[in-house]
Amino acid sequence: MADAETRLYGVIGFPARHSLSPVMHNAAFRALGINAVYLAFEVPPEELGEAIGGAKALGISGLNVTMPHKEAVIHFLDSLSEDSGEIGSVNTVVNRKGRLEGHTTDGLGARRALERAIELGGRRILIIGAGGAGKAIAYELSRDNEVVVLNRTPEKAKALERFGITGDALNRENLGEYLEWAEVLINATSVGMNSWETPVPAELLRRDLVVMDIVYKPLKTRLLTEAELRGCKTVDGLWMLVYQGIESFRLWTGFKPDEGLMRGAALEGISE
């Protein structure tokens, strides 16, 4: 039960009601005996600054940031981690004595999720999408892999070239060409969220490809379903959610929750 000592955490996004982060983090707080609660806050873009100011004034201990705020939130924070500053994306906010620090755990979450299916290092990775999550994933994976990012607005993808990442336009021709080259495909867009859409035509998928989708509702997106039918190894978006959540939790509390516990709680949330 909440009391005067209960710490408050949450996720801000638009929409945010679909988020599984509350059930996941609240399960971890209970398991570790931490007096805290985690809520979802639906914040439209025009109210983002007020929301962050309110969180600071109320002493909210930490936030996750999801679409469409991962880039815009930077303008309202006091400091950024090196990674967040480099890529211009934040998915985790830590309140340290009234100063709001921005961090990104998306890239690390994606890395740990992918490592469930393939050993990384020297891999050829194609990422679709150069939004907040896509940039963070590309930046992290480019440390030890060759990464190409395709985006409908090619300028956003090409802006990543200073990190040794290849950026190009997302169109059928480029998609087919780069998929012939790639060992790993990651959908870092929202295409497929609560819909039967896919960013990649099934005929472009080949058997030896590892396919990951950051979308986790539905758990088996059309992309993952068609990839499995083609014989591909797949990684669902819930694993990335779990691993980025574990790192956010560690930044807030200093504790590392159990991944099985967090995924189990998230799976229950999906089925409700």
Curated annotation (Swiss-Prot):
Q: Which organism is it from?
A: Thermococcus kodakarensis (strain ATCC BAA-918 / JCM 12380 / KOD1) (Pyrococcus kodakaraensis (strain KOD1))
Active-site residues from the entry: 70 (proton acceptor)
* NCBIfam families reported for this sequence: aroE, PRK00258.3-3
- InterPro entries recorded for this chain? Aminoacid_DH-like_N_sf, NAD(P)-bd_dom_sf, SDH_C, Shikimate_DH, Shikimate_DH-bd_N, Shikimate_DH_fam, Shikm_DH/Glu-tRNA_Rdtase
Name-wise, this protein is Shikimate dehydrogenase (NADP(+))
Its family remark reads: Belongs to the shikimate dehydrogenase family.
**This protein's encoding gene:** aroE
Keywords, comma-separated and alphabetical: Amino-acid biosynthesis, Aromatic amino acid biosynthesis, NADP, Oxidoreductase
Quote the EC number.
1.1.1.25
